Amino acid sequence: DIERRSADYSEGTTASYDYFTQLRERTRTLDGIAAWTKVSLTLADRGQGNAVYGNMVSGNYFSLLGVRPALGRFFAPDEDRTPLTHPVVVVSHGFWQSALGSDSGAIGRAVTVNGNPYTLIGVAPAGFRGVFSPLRVDAWVPLMMQQQLRSTRDLEDAAWLRTFGRLAPGSSVGQARQELTALTVAYIADRGERGGNRDYNTIRLSALTGLPADAREGFLGFMQLLLGA
């Protein structure tokens, strides 16, 4: 059964970038898999800085959730391919109102994120706060910028990501768990790793508590015990 305790989805990071991309390419029970991780940001517009809670996300994060921007756009496919090439940022509707004065002209504006030049490309819809409800996210940046914003992490191997997916039509939670477990075991075998005493036979699935109750159906946050070197 799907786990409903939000704590299950918030405890630690669970996937390396390499593991995430392999799951995304090989899954058949899920329509898509996206990844995110938390990051502390200082976002400054015209010299006025604001400390915000942010997320770094895969390029399909918003599209998989079916979220549409209130203004501007979300991340394009080419902004999710090459590290450090697309310094762009999306802000929450609340941040746009409180820090940017509800200025529709803010789209395309040069801002700074942790002192680095970025372009503001979009505003999330009112009420959208990310996929983990206890925390309100005010800014989203591409995973590909992680070396600039989290320089101690290696994009390929470190276990620094949380992942979620959307069930494909006709697929059940049980089928998704079985497939994800098999893909995880195969991933470990391909890398020549051994699990020691860790149990790889259970994939914990949880509801995405940050989404409205009527929008959660079909979405699964998942945790596994591997991950990374």
Task: Show the residue positions of the predicted features.
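Short, well-ordered beta-to-alpha junction loops that form the rim of enzyme active sites
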Residues: W36-K38, Q48, V123
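A short gly/proline-enriched turn/hairpin at secondary-structure junctions
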Residues: R5, A44-G47, R73
